[in-house]
A protein has these predicted regions:
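N-terminal signal peptide c-region/cleavage motif recognized by signal peptidases
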Residues: 21-23
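Compact alpha-helical subdomains of small soluble proteins
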Residues: 58-127
């Protein structure tokens, strides 16, 4: 990740950490791993969706326009999603279905792991 992406990700993590620290999940406290699974799972799914758009040839501007229409999304989270879009479009568009599927899976996994690694560091003292 680039410096601006790291700064944006830290803001995202701080917001999510604040939400997680007061959250109650199904009448029991959410554990650190539960929080990581929920938040980073959502990031992975979003990254998969964006990379799928990339691999089918959708224009980056369309993805940005859809993101900009999200009125209820907090700005730091929206900015982080924008960085995911930028990162996806820095990757090549593949011509074969097999390579496209691999690119989608690898990108989703990469974004999930980036999120999980950052949360592990930020939440190290909790639980």
């Amino acid at each position: 990740m680039k410096i601006s992406e790291i700064k944006m990700f830290r803001i995202f993590i701080i917001l999510c950490t604040a939400l997680v620290s007061v959250n109650v999940y199904a009448e029991k406290k959410m554990t650190k791993n539960d929080a990581i699974d929920v938040i980073c799972g959502g990031i992975g799914e979003y990254a998969e969706s964006v990379m799928t758009s990339r691999q089918v040839g959708e224009n980056i501007a369309n993805n940005i326009a859809v993101l900009n229409k999200q009125k209820n999304m907090e700005e730091p989270i929206k900015s982080y999603h924008r960085e995911i879009i930028y990162e996806a479009y820095r990757e090549p568009k593949w011509s074969t279905k097999e390579n496209q599927d691999n690119a989608i899976t690898e990108f989703s996994n990469k974004m999930y792991m980036t999120c999980a690694d950052a949360f592990q560091k930020e939440l190290a003292g909790l639980e």
